[in-house]
């Protein structure tokens, strides 16, 4: 296991709120996929799904023994709230923000990188696979 990993996260909902899911992909520094997953989370907003994906991905990275994580996501709100550029005003998001910060505190270093949507295709795929599998 690599001490440093890259973590792509994405969350989505079909409707806002609507059926929602999380997705993440973890790679080592050479691009080898260490883990990827998508999971439905019930009815939620897109922002709740984004935070839930971050938490799930960070917990998975911790489970792999990572010490440093570079988080990559296309959610401007998520990335800017996690770096402190934006304040967290919504009470539901604040709880998730606090949980994400607690999980992130277990690493030696966490870096947040906001990326274009096109660069987050693998995490987005996990979200859509989970939502499609749960659809009636």
Please give the residue ranges for each predicted region.
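RNase H-like nuclease fold core
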Residues: 1-48, 52, 59-67
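RNase H catalytic domain
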Residues: 12-16, 55-135
